Amino acid sequence: MAEDVRAEIVASVLEVVVNEGDQIDKGDVVVLLESMKMEIPVLAEAAGTVSKVAVSVGDVIQAGDLIAVIS
């Protein structure tokens, strides 16, 4: 079952840590966001394979936007 990784806040994408096809564990950092001059790691809530990365460095994302999909 696929697990969507979504943004919880409005932020810009500072770094994309994973690539499509990567095996990740629950708690691994998926992306680093920047909001109000703070770096905020977005963590995987499930282990699996990254099947889609929906953001790029520099993107401005809104709360609820899709960041990645873990299968």
UniProtKB/Swiss-Prot annotation:
CDD domains: biotinyl_domain. Signal peptide: none annotated. The keyword Nucleotide-binding does not apply. Keywords: Biotin. Residues 2-71 form the Biotinyl-binding domain. The modification N6-biotinyllysine is found at K37. It comes from the Bacteria. The keyword Kinase does not apply. PANTHER family: OXALOACETATE DECARBOXYLASE ALPHA CHAIN. This is Biotinylated protein TB7.3. It comes from Mycobacterium tuberculosis (strain ATCC 25618 / H37Rv).
